[in-house]
Each structure stands twice: as C-alpha cells, then as structure tokens.
C-alpha cells in the first residue's frame, strides 16, 4: 500500500537528522555533525536549512508531502524543541498531519537488525541513560516495556538479564536517525496523528537549567510567581 511522501525529523541528539521517504523508501537524508559544543548544532539556523536541502535533494516540495513525522525523544532538550517547532511549522503551513515516533525506536530502526532483543540507549546526563527494550523478528520491531532512566554502570547487567544486545549513542555505535521512520511507518500511521496545538516532545527529564533553578529556590519552577 502506498503511503506517499513523508518528511521525517529527529532532534534527540545534537546530530539531528532529516529524511524524505517515498512510501517505505528513503529518497534523501541529511544529518548534522555532532560537535563538542552541543548548543551550536541544535539551533534552528542549522536545522532548518538541512530540512530545505533534504527536500531539494529528493526533488520534493513541501506541498507534495503527505505528512511530517517527528522524533519525540527522549533526548536533548534544546534540539528536541527545535525539531518539534520545525515539524509543527511545516504541518501547519502545509495543512498536513503531524505524527510522532520514539527516538529510541529510531536507533533500532535506522538499519536492518538481526532478530532478537535490543536495548536501545541514549545519554541522559549525570552518568545515566534513557533506555528501552525492543524485539526484532523478521524486520518487525516491537516495544518491550516503556522507556526508563538507568545508571550507565547498570547497562551491561540490565542487557544480560533481558538477553538483549546493547545499542545506542551512549556507546558510540548508533544514534537515532530520521531514516528509521521508513522501517516503522506503518506502526506510526496506526498510532494516530498528533494534536498539533498540544503535542510536545517527551524530554525524559527536566532541563538542566530548570533543575538548577529548583535546587537554588527549593521549589518547583511551576510554583514560581
């Protein structure tokens, strides 16, 4: 079944990515370079031109798109917000639906994986990681439980207990990539579109600035005022 043209974005890491997908085939893709000073690569002035370049590479106009899919996190607070803002803007500007997908799922989905259990991880700072378990069988990827925050030094034990292979950018072997949307597009469509006005990324934890503010003031930021 044809699914038309999909624009996919992910900003869960500082190496943000974009892909244009026709049905289930990636026809163009781009990725920002991950840099030592993360604030520089997640900014809109870098991400938006990458989106435009990717559309141009695929010879696709925004008006040709059937939908936009955005990685929902967890991950980098700033980069997730940038990608989400761009995705929402394109959806509103073109009148197409917005869908969301787990960025941890995109780690597994970006390449063909052997059948079995996989524990996908992303850095969560403070010597912790975001982690979620997935099963792969005949190229079908399924979630096995929700995303969690684990301590880095518990990862090997956690994976061994689950009989899973570790994969993810905290280990330097994979990052989420928007191209992974092609492998899981059917599940994304089945999950339903997002309400553009209310949808926000799943950051996984409070922003570092908010943590510091609450520690200094002894109360939640939401209680300020």
Label each region the model flagged.
Residues 1-29, 40-46, 99-225:
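Oxyanion-binding and handling regions
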Residues 3, 65-68:
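Phosphate-coordination loops involved in phosphoryl transfer and adenosine-cofactor binding
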Residues 27-36, 67-70:
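Glycine/charged-rich beta-loop-alpha catalytic/anionic-binding loops adjacent to active sites
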Residues 35-56:
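N-terminal phosphate-binding loop and adjacent alpha-helix
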Residues 51-66, 136, 157-164:
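Phosphate/pyrophosphate-binding loops at sites that engage ATP/ADP/AMP, CoA/4′-phosphopantetheine
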Residues 52-53, 88, 92, 183, ...:
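Short glycine/serine- and small hydrophobic-enriched flexible loop segments
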Residues 56-63, 91-101:
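Phosphate-handling active-site elements
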Residues 67-98:
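DPxDG-like acidic metal-binding loop motif
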């Amino acid at each position: 079944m044809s699914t038309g043209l999909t624009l996919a974005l992910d900003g869960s890491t500082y190496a943000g990515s974009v892909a244009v997908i026709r049905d289930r085939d990636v026809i163009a893709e781009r990725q920002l370079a991950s840099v030592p000073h993360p604030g520089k690569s997640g900014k809109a002035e870098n991400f938006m031109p990458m989106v435009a370049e990717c559309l141009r590479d695929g010879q696709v106009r925004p008006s040709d798109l059937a939908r936009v899919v955005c990685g929902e996190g967890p991950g980098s607070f700033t980069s997730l917000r940038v990608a989400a803002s761009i995705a929402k803007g394109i959806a509103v500007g073109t009148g197409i639906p917005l869908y969301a997908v787990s960025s941890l799922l995109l780690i597994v989905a970006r390449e063909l994986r052997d059948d079995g259990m996989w524990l996908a991880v992303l850095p969560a700072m403070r010597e912790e990681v975001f982690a979620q378990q997935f099963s792969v069988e005949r190229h079908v990827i399924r979630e096995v439980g929700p995303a969690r925050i684990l301590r880095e030094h518990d990862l090997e034990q956690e994976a061994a207990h689950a009989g899973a292979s570790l994969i993810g950018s905290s280990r330097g072997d994979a990052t989420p990539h928007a191209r992974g949307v092609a492998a899981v597009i059917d599940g994304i469509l089945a999950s339903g579109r997002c309400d553009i006005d209310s949808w926000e990324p799943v950051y996984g934890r409070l922003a570092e600035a908010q943590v510091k503010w609450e520690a200094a003031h002894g109360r939640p930021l939401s209680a300020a005022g």
